[in-house]
A protein has these predicted regions:
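Surface-exposed, low-hydrophobicity interaction/linker segments
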Residues: 10-69
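Sequence-level motif detector for i,i+2 pairs with an aromatic at +2
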Residues: 29, 69, 76, 109, ...
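Short, well-ordered strand-loop elements centered on a beta-strand within folded domains, enriched
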Residues: 46, 92-97, 125-126
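Helix-rich interaction surfaces within compact, conserved domain-sized segments
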Residues: 99-160
Length: 160
């Protein structure tokens, strides 16, 4: 409870994105469109993904429209690190992934997801419910600030 009170008193980080309807849609249907890329709110499925780091190779084993699950995570107070290694060389990609993992570990991975997104024009975009921050280059300090300010800042922060 103390964390929720502290988070409510702290200013949110990142750019504000207008919050869309949070209604549930049937799994397998396209939950979009969304008003940002990646999404920060909107229609979604009634279930979510587990916290953790998803690699590009994981995408083939995931259900269609992963955004439908991930927006539900955002509604539960998650922060998502959306990354695109296609805009980096191999060494840059590994540095980005290592930096993301390190920040996630600092927060014990609680309510944190890293997820690849090919549509990004920058290497990293972090989102929370109604908030978005783009990174032209990884900045661990900025990433930590985003997590501290925005994790649990959502309609259902106490949900798992």
């Amino acid at each position: 409870m103390g964390l929720l009170v502290w988070n409510g008193a702290q200013a949110a980080a990142g750019k504000e994105v207008p919050v869309l309807s949070a209604s549930h849609v049937e799994k397998g249907t396209n939950p979009g469109p969304y008003n940002s890329d990646p999404p920060t709110s909107g229609q979604h499925y009634a279930s979510e993904f587990e916290a953790g780091f998803f690699n590009e190779a994981d995408l083939t084993s995931l259900p269609a429209y992963p955004e439908g699950y991930l927006v539900h995570n955002l509604e539960h107070g998650y922060v998502i690190f959306w990354y695109n290694c296609a805009v980096l060389d191999e060494a840059g990609c590994e540095q980005l992934k290592t930096g993301i993992r390190d920040v996630m570990e600092e927060f014990d991975g609680v309510k944190l997801i890293a997820f690849p997104r090919a549509s990004l024009q920058v290497p990293l975009v972090m989102t929370s419910w109604g908030r978005l921050q783009e990174f032209g280059a990884f900045d661990a300090g900025q990433a930590r600030r985003f997590v501290r300010a925005n994790r649990y800042r959502a309609p259902e922060p106490a949900a798992p």
